[in-house]
From Swiss-Prot:
Record region (Disordered): 117-171
Phenotypic consequence of gene deletion: Disruption blocks the export of seven endogenous Tat substrates.
The record's note on its domains: The membrane-extrinsic domain forms parallel contacts with at least one other TatB protein.
Main location: membrane
Family: Belongs to the TatB family.
Tagged with keyword Cell membrane: yes
Induction per the UniProt record: Constitutively expressed.
Membrane topology: Single-pass membrane protein
Self-association and partners: The Tat system comprises two distinct complexes: a TatABC complex, containing multiple copies of TatA, TatB and TatC subunits, and a separate TatA complex, containing only TatA subunits. Substrates initially bind to the TatABC complex, which probably triggers association of the separate TatA complex to form the active translocon. A complex containing only TatA and TatB has also been identified. It could be either an assembly intermediate or a disassembly intermediate generated during translocation activity.
GO cellular component entries: plasma membrane; TAT protein transport complex
Chain ranges passing through the membrane: 1-21
Listed name of the protein: Sec-independent protein translocase protein TatB
BP GO terms, sorted: intracellular protein transmembrane transport; protein transport by the Tat complex
Length: 171
């Protein structure tokens, strides 16, 4: 991959030994080897994906060529029937556009009302119906709960710590 000979590899090893020292050189070699391994696997993956994409593109191109060839090699009977179908589809399309049933259906189902600007004009001649019974709910007072009494901090007596027995208090 890098086209390095034995003498060049030996020279790089000696320079690395002088620069890094005998303790850090093995760690550096492992790190560089890991980088090279990762680059190789990445290059292989990219190469495989490109190869698959090229094969897929070639397959699609050949498929298109076969489809075009099969359409040009149709029998005259099939060509005539395809032309008839195209003409029938176009005539149906033209008649559908000319007699658009959806527009006619929308127009037939549209309710035409004059715009009412005044609220009183909308309710002209309408009287409200009288209610036979009026709904009511029983009157209840909300329940009150007594609030807890809190003693002020001034009434509280400070507690003093009891002296602890020590060895000097003994007789």
């Amino acid at each position: 991959m890098f086209d390095i000979g034995f003498s060049e590899l030996l020279l790089v090893f000696i320079i690395g030994l002088v620069v890094l020292g005998p303790q850090r050189l093995p760690v550096a070699v492992k790190t560089v080897a890991g980088w090279i391994r990762a680059l190789r696997s990445l290059a292989t993956t990219v190469q495989n994906e490109l190869t698959q994409e090229l094969k897929l593109q070639e397959f699609q191109d050949s498929l298109k060529k076969v489809e075009k060839a099969s359409l040009t090699n149709l029998t005259p009977e099939l060509k005539a029937s395809m032309d008839e179908l195209r003409q029938a589809a176009e005539s149906m399309k033209r008649s559908y556009v000319a007699n658009d049933p959806e527009k006619a259906s929308d127009e037939a189902h549209t309710i035409h009302n004059p715009v009412v600007k005044d609220n009183e004009a909308a309710h002209e001649g309408v009287t409200p119906a009288a209610a036979q019974t009026q709904a009511s709910s029983p009157e209840q007072k909300p329940e009150t709960t007594p609030e807890p009494v809190v003693k002020p901090a001034a009434d509280a007596e400070p507690k003093t710590a009891a002296p602890s027995p020590s060895s000097s208090d003994k007789p």
